[in-house]
């Protein structure tokens, strides 16, 4: 019973890392003649106790999988940029347009439990 409870709590409080892409531009180009390959949205989340003690965070080495790091904090802007570089290599992109990043915090029970996320988005160009 204790193992099942621990597994359930781990699943609830685990962070995750996701990469969403869209690549259907219907022939649309950019003003300077470059061709967009895909739009990328990267999210890395973590759960924090008292806004500073990491309970679980997404594993940037395994996006879109249930790869989480318990009791460690992988929630950095640099990790999001590293995932973006890997996606650029995967699709053969040479440039980036409209790069944007933001951090969000959602507190539950005041400051007891916080879900923090870094979001990074960009258009990859050829």
Which residues fall in each region the model found?
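C-terminal edge-of-domain segments
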Residues: 116-126
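Sec-dependent bacterial lipoprotein signal peptides
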Residues: 1-16
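Bacterial Sec signal peptide processing site at the extreme N-terminus
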Residues: 14-31
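Short secondary-structure capping micro-motifs at structural edges
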Residues: 24-28, 83-85, 108-109
């Amino acid at each position: 019973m204790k193992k099942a409870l621990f597994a359930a709590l781990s699943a609830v409080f685990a962070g995750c890392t996701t990469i969403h892409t869209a690549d259907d531009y219907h022939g649309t180009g950019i003003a300077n003649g470059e061709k967009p390959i895909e739009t990328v949205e990267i999210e890395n989340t973590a759960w924090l106790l008292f806004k500073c003690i990491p309970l679980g965070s997404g594993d940037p080495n395994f996006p879109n999988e249930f790869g989480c790091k318990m009791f460690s904090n992988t929630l950095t802007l640099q990790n999001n940029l590293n995932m973006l570089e890997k996606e650029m290599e995967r699709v053969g992109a040479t440039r980036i347009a409209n790069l944007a990043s933001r951090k969000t915090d959602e507190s539950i029970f005041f400051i007891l439990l916080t879900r923090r996320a870094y979001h990074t988005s960009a258009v990859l160009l050829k």
